Amino acid sequence: MDGVLVDSNAHHRGAWRALLDELGVTPAQPEYWWLTIGRPSTEAVPLLLGRVVDIAEAHRLADRKLEHYRRLSRHGLPAVRGVSAFLDELAAQSVPCAVATSATRGDTDLLLNRLGLLERFAAVVTAEDVRRGKPDPEVYLLAARAIRIEPSDCLVFEDAIVGVQAARRAGMRVIGVTTAHRETELRTAGVERVVADFEGVTWPA
């Protein structure tokens, strides 16, 4: 969802930066933000801190990051360019669509409702629905099952490397969206095509 349907990556980056500043933590690598993209926040926390974190602390810090994110995005977030028109085209052709996201159910419903996109999807699978986050394929396999489409017949749009890995492990085709990673990185991860957004994207893609 983030970076594919909703243009929210800058707000997430700012929220993680605020959390690290609050904790007085300096990331081990300058591109620390990439460690978080596409992952549930509870799984991103130990990667950012560079140490083992127990479940209680992971949830506490993930909740704090969420507070920062909601503060930064309180005035709303835009949809990724062209996504609404593309979803209209899919609906006109009766193509079933699902969301498979590492975001929470509450944030997913809130953001997609605000943008008028939630009703476009036959199924929404979120962080609460899976035992293992991306790059594990579980979220994508659950989404495919929910819309009754074989994984090999699914096409995924992903901006995150771990998301591309998850979709590929699920046996799905993937198109990369360059809102978070560079084209070369997405192609190395296994996407078959790369787009900047949904302007000019048509179905079949």
Task: Cite the ranges covered by each PLM segment.
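Conserved SAM-binding loop
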Residues: 5, 34, 79, 97-100, ...
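N-terminal helical cap/lid subdomain that shapes the substrate entry/recognition surface
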Residues: 1-93, 106
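Asp-based, Mg2+/Mn2+-dependent phosphohydrolase catalytic module
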Residues: 88-91, 104-205
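Conserved phosphate-binding/catalytic loop of the ribokinase/pfkB sugar-kinase fold
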Residues: 74-76, 99, 115
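N-terminal start-of-chain detector that recognizes signal peptides
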Residues: 16-18, 68-70, 96-98, 127-128, ...
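Conserved catalytic-core motifs of eukaryotic protein kinase domains, centered on the activation segment
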Residues: 10, 101, 110
